[in-house]
Amino acid sequence: MERLRYYIAQFLSYTLHPGIMPTAGTIFIISTLPEVFTWDFVIRITSVVFLGTYVGPLVGILILRISGVISSVHLIKREERIYPYLIGAASMIATGNHLERAGVPVEITLSVYLSGMVVVLSTILLPFFKSSAHAAGVSAFYALYICLHQRYGGGEIQYLVLGAMVLGGLSWARLELKRHTLNELLSGALLGFVPMFLLLSK
């Protein structure tokens, strides 16, 4: 049973990786907005977000690992998160700038910028404790879902309940793997949810 719990926790951690949340958010935004978009536009914008918010930071982490700056790509040690976080934030902000100049829907641009801002805030807090990036990513997506539901009627109420259950499941997974404390999960959730909700709920 203990081994099964471990595998379930690992599955949830990889499936709900914070790096894929901006891409998932972009797909949800495009599907919710009242405008009609061509498949070419959808693929192009989604690809840009994926490359800038997942592939770019991942390549940075791999380079840091190969060069010996960090000891693991899992960034378990708090002090080893600083450089990867800075690289990730820079990549996300640059992606947001590119999207803004390309004239994509403002919700996509803001969500990518906010992702970068959350990473910056997490970096600032690192000397004190490591906030959960997983909790921040899922909470930011949850806030995005609520805001788009309020603004455009996108999504269903029951999925809000499901989203809360997913966040609870992720929190259990990170605790089960002993990657975070409850306080680190809570701080990550607040870092992800509050900025996204405050900006997009207007």
What residue spans do the PLM features occupy?
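Loop-to-helix transition at the N-terminal end of transmembrane alpha-helices
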Residues: 39-55, 77-79, 186-189
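Short, Lys/Arg-rich, polar N-terminal cytosolic tail immediately upstream
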Residues: 1-9
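The first (N-terminal) embedded transmembrane alpha-helix
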Residues: 12-33
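C-terminal halves and exits of single transmembrane alpha-helices
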Residues: 85-104, 126-131
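Juxtamembrane helix-capping/reentrant segments at transmembrane boundaries
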Residues: 12, 72-87
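Membrane-interface helix-boundary motifs at transmembrane edges
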Residues: 37-40, 67-79, 101-106, 179-183
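Transmembrane alpha-helical segments of multi-pass membrane transport proteins and ion-pumping complexes
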Residues: 18, 22-23, 53-65, 89-93, ...
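Membrane-embedded catalytic cores of phosphoryl/pyrophosphoryl-handling enzymes
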Residues: 108-202
